[in-house]
Amino acid sequence: MSTPKSASFFTRKNILAFSFFIAFLVVVSVLVTVFFLDIKTGDVKTIINTINRTNWPWILLIVLGIVVTLAWNIIINWWVARRFCFHAPWWEWVLFACVVQFFQIVTPLSLGQDPFRLYWFIKKGMKKQTAVLLVTSTGAFWNLAQALITWPSFFVLSQNYALLEQNHEGFVSYWFSFAGMIFDVVVAILFIFIAYSKRMHVLIYSGVNQFRKWIKRPYLTKEQIYQRFIDKAEFNKLYGLEIKRLGLTIFKLLANILIAVVGYFSVFAVFAIVKKENATNNVIDQYSTADIFNITNIAITASNFIPVPSGEGATQFVMTSFLNAFKSAVGIESQVKQGVFLWRFLSVYIPAILFSLCFIGWVVQVVIEFKHPKPVLPTVNLINHHFWNNKKLHN
C-alpha cells in the first residue's frame, strides 16, 4: 500500500533540501582538507608533476578498487533481492550502486549507505521486513572484513612496540589506532545486535517514533510497536537462517576482504606513482611492501578515531609516525603528504564528484516518480513464504 503524498516525508522540497545539504557537506569536507593540509593550487600541480610516468599503470589498481566496489554493490544486492522476487531494470541497479557508493564516501564511517539501501528497496515495493533482513544480513561484513585484515597487521606492528614507545608520535598513534580498531569491532557487533535483538528493536522504534511525533509525522502507537516485537521473533529465525547460508555468508566475507585488500594496497600504488628517480628517500625503497601494507591499513582504520580533521590528516599523521618509528628517513613526510593526498584525490574526491552526478540523477528520478507514480511489483511476503515452506516440510 503506497503512502499518501501528504504523509510522505520524501517530498520534492525535502529531497531538494537534502541534496543541497549533501552538496554543502562535500564542499565543506574538501575545504577543510585543503586548508588543514595547507594544500594550494601550486601544491596540486607539483604533486601532478612529480608523478613517475613509468609507474602510471599503478593508477589502474586504484581504478580497479572503485570498479570492484561498484560491482559488489550491484551483484550482492541483486543476488539476494532476486530470491524475494524483487526485480529492477539493469540501469536502475547501476544507478543504485553509484548512489550507494556516493553515500559510502560522503557520510562518516559510511553510515549513510544502509539507510539509503533500505529506503530504495522499500520504495521499489519490497516489504519492510524483507528489506531490513536484506540490508542487515549484508551490512556487518565490511566491518568484520576490516577486523580480519587489520588486527593481524596490528599484531605484527606490536612486535615493534619498543620502537614505537621511544617515538612520542608513534606511541600516540599506536594507542589511537588500537582505539579505532576496537571502535570498528564495536560497530560490527552493534550492527548484528541491533538486527537480532528484539529489545533493541523496540527501543530503536520507540526513539524513532518519538522523533516522528515531535516533527508531527505519522508514528506507531505502543501497541503497534509491541506487535512488531512479536513479529521480531519470527524475523530472528529468518535472520539466523540467512546467516547460516554458509556459501552466501562466506562469499560476502571474502568479497569484502578482497575489496579492503585492494583499497589498502592502492596506497602502495600511489607511493610507486610519486616515486622519485635517482632518490634514496622514496617510501617504497625505504620500507618493505609488507610494512607499507600493514601500516596503511592500520592508519586508515585509525582515522576513525584520531582527533584530526579530515581523513588525509589522520592517515598522514599515523603513517608518518609509524614509518619514522620503524626507520627515521629524511624527507618522507613530504612524500607521505603527497601520496596520501593523491590517493584520496583518485579514490575519494574524483569518485565523489562522479557519483554525485548519479545522486542528482536519482533525485530527479524520485521527483519524476513522485509526480507520476507507477505501480510497483510486490515481492514475496517473507514471513508467510518461509512459514509456508516450513509447514509443508513438517507435514
From Swiss-Prot:
Any GO CC annotation of this UniProt entry: plasma membrane
Topological relation to the membrane, as annotated: Multi-pass membrane protein
Pfam families, A to Z: LPG_synthase_TM
InterPro entries: L-PG_synthase/AglD
Chain segments annotated as transmembrane: 15-35, 56-76, 86-106, 131-151, 175-195, 254-274, 298-318, 348-368
Compartments (UniProt record): Cell membrane
Domain of life assignment: Bacteria
UniProt keyword annotations, A-Z: Cell membrane, Membrane, Transmembrane, Transmembrane helix
Entry keyword annotation includes Cell membrane: yes
Predominant place of localization: membrane
Protein name as catalogued: Uncharacterized protein MG306 homolog
